[in-house]
Regions:
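Short, solvent-exposed loop/helix junctions and linker helices
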Residues: 44-48, 52-55, 92-97, 123
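C-terminal motif of bacterial Sec signal peptides marking the signal peptidase cleavage site
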Residues: 20-23
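Extracytoplasmic electron-transfer domains, predominantly the class I c-type cytochrome c fold
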Residues: 75-119, 126-133
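A charged, solvent-exposed segment within the mature domains of Sec-exported extracytoplasmic proteins
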Residues: 124-149
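Electrostatic cytochrome c docking/interface patches
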Residues: 25-53, 143-149
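Bacterial N-terminal signal peptides that target proteins for export
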Residues: 2-14
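Periplasmic/extracellular electron-transfer cofactor-ligation site
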Residues: 27-30, 51-78, 108-114, 136-143
Length: 149
């Protein structure tokens, strides 16, 4: 069998739909290098683990680029957080939250704003997810290391 489509409009409708659906559901490219986020180096393996979790649990509300524009966002009373701007109400004075504070917020969720708690997720997964979320904003790459209490 030979398919000869010149662009999407020249394809049979079912094939065009299949291409659109499959092509729009691609995860972000894999990380091959570590990144410094919040002043600490995060391995490529951890970032890839976080990316996989994000695309499994978060992308429907927060969107592929972390902009809060996922397909489910339209049905929510409050818009999901836009991770690109790195502003968190639970951080003091508009600063970036500590890594553990971000992990804790993911775990507990924000039920009153539509974000479910992820209490059943392993600590390692929560941490990797928090690290991946940081990749959306340059603020995390520019941040100094967290102060040790």
């Amino acid at each position: 069998m030979t398919l000869s489509c010149r662009g999407l409009m020249g394809c049979p409708p079912t094939l065009a739909l299949w291409v659109l659906v499959c092509g729009c559901n691609q995860a972000a490219p894999a990380f091959t290098e570590p990144m410094t986020l919040g002043g600490r180096e995060v391995s490529a393996d951890t970032l890839n683990q976080g990316r996989d979790l994000y695309f499994k649990y978060c992308v429907s509300c927060h969107g592929e680029t972390g902009a809060g524009d996922g397909p489910a966002a339209r049905s929510l009373k409050f818009p999901p957080r836009d991770f690109r701007v790195a502003k968190f109400s639970f951080a003091k004075d508009g600063e970036l939250p500590a890594h553990q504070a971000l992990v804790d917020r993911i775990r507990s969720g924000v039920p009153e704003r539509g974000m479910p708690p992820w209490t059943g997720m392993r600590e390692e997964d929560l941490s990797a997810l928090a690290d991946y979320i940081k990749t959306f904003s340059p603020a995390w790459r520019e941040a100094a290391p967290e102060a040790v209490p």
